[in-house]
Amino acid sequence: MQDRLISGTEKPEDHFDRAIRPTSLADYIGQPVVREQMEIFIGAARGRGEALDHTLIFGPPGLGKTTLANIIAREMGGNLKSTSGPVLERAGDLAAMLTNLEEGDVLFIDEIHRLSPVIEEILYPAMEDYQLDIMIGEGPAARSIKLDLPPFTLVAATTRAGLLTSPLRDRFGIVQRLEFYSVEDLTHIVSRSANLMDVPITVEGAEEVARRSRGTPRIANRLLRRVRDYAQVKGTGEVNHEMAQRALDMLNVDKAGLDTLDRRYLSMLLERFDGGPAGVEALAAAMAEDSGTLEDVIEPYLIQQGYVMRTARGRIATNQSYLQFGMTPPEPKN
């Protein structure tokens, strides 16, 4: 898949965002339902002097799952120990992390849907009973010993909650889904980031960046950096509406936040498959892309914005897709 400026997946350049991430729920912009619930859950756990229930955070990439995990650790007054599903290859890898936890710490596992079954089996007693089962020795002489673990909170993140096994999913007391952000919330995020980056920006400039950011803070901050560069070279350095518009047009990010790959997907669905229904495998083959890329990277935003419907028979283009390409929507079928 081509490198996408508006991809929600983290890139090396996005590591800069860590310096401008909010560090408390009070500074956390957007996701009002999640924020209110976590304020209550964290406040109650702190009041009882207990570890927060294990928490699963899921949603499309770039919406702030890692940021929320960091905030949870800070609000609970514990240390954050981070890892990811693909990194935990051996039982010893997870055992080492668990035995190094202190009371109240938060263990963050990103991409938890990629854990192996062996690692999951170790997690079950650790999550339920704060115990770690370890095998000592090999063969007939092998024996199992139990180690007590301090009360801790497992915070897990995934873009594909449906791939979690039921036994693992059922062990999370708190499950939060992050939704795409509104233009209003993203405008506040862009303004806040610009202020921290010492970039002069108008409300209209911030709103234009927000409108084309696909409801995703990571993309908004990435576009802001590129617009800043454009304004510095082509203007006075201030990001106003005109500067943002010209910069984003140059970057092939249109007013709807769609890029070349989005338009190619919609064009393929409309023209090659007559608007659908089309199976994801057929679409992926026609685009020479992986079906997982379509499902995880391209389709979530297009579906959320009403360009595509996902049905049992396949993907169907909506009237909005036809209008986006200046085409006349088909007459409804009787």
From Swiss-Prot:
Key words of the record: ATP-binding, Cytoplasm, DNA damage, DNA recombination, DNA repair, DNA-binding, Hydrolase, Nucleotide-binding
Binding site for ATP: I20, R21, G62, K65, T66, T67, E128, D129, Y130, R171, Y181, R218
Region ranges (Head domain (RuvB-H)): 255-334
Chain intervals for the UniProt region annotation (Large ATPase domain (RuvB-L)): 1-181
Entries under InterPro entries matching the protein: AAA+_ATPase (IPR003593), AAA_lid_4 (IPR041445), DNA_helicase_Holl-junc_RuvB (IPR004605), P-loop_NTPase (IPR027417), RuvB-like_N (IPR008824), RuvB_C (IPR008823), WH-like_DNA-bd_sf (IPR036388), WH_DNA-bd_sf (IPR036390)
GO cellular component, one term: Holliday junction resolvase complex
UniProt-recorded name of the protein: Holliday junction branch migration complex subunit RuvB
